[in-house]
Amino acid sequence: MPAKHVAAEDDVRAVSDQFYSALEAMANGDASSMSNIWSHEDDVTTMHPIGGREQGWDAVRGAWEGVASASTDGTVTRTDQVIRVIGNGAYELCTESASMTLAGEPVSLEGRATNVYRKEKGEWKVVHHHADYHDEFAEIVANMGA
């Protein structure tokens, strides 16, 4: 694999590390660091374990903030990471594991995730996150009115 390609994968991996740190912060009540690593364009999307789909930075940010407002004691990790770079785009496949207290209820989940990145003004940004649907997580969020 050419050195330039490996370097690009390393750059995306660094942003992924920041994203998973931000996910863990969100699982502890603080979604503010998401703003630094996500694109703020209208075409960004997310499909969380709670179901549904958000499109546009304002909707995506709102979903993260809604979950963060009811989350404490969280840990989020990933395994089985695969990253591929294609020009100014990249994707990541992995398995996510998370546990937290959500709206007073302890919840744990493990599932597949896909993240998509785009290079904007020389920096890699998250433009899409998709995690497997999780019944218990979705039910708790639905009951809290998020």
Identify the role of each PLM range.
Residues 71-73, 99-108:
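Short, cysteine-centered beta-strand-loop-beta hairpins and adjacent loop/turn segments enriched
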Residues 83-91, 105, 117-125:
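A short, structured loop/turn motif at beta-sheet edges
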Residues 64, 78-84, 95-98, 112-118, ...:
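Hydrophobic/aromatic beta-strand elements that line small-molecule binding cavities or substrate pockets
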Residues 103-105, 136-142:
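A short, polar/proline- and glycine-enriched secondary-structure boundary/capping micro-motif
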Residues 9-17, 25, 31-87:
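A solvent-exposed, acidic/Ser-Thr-rich amphipathic alpha-helical stretch
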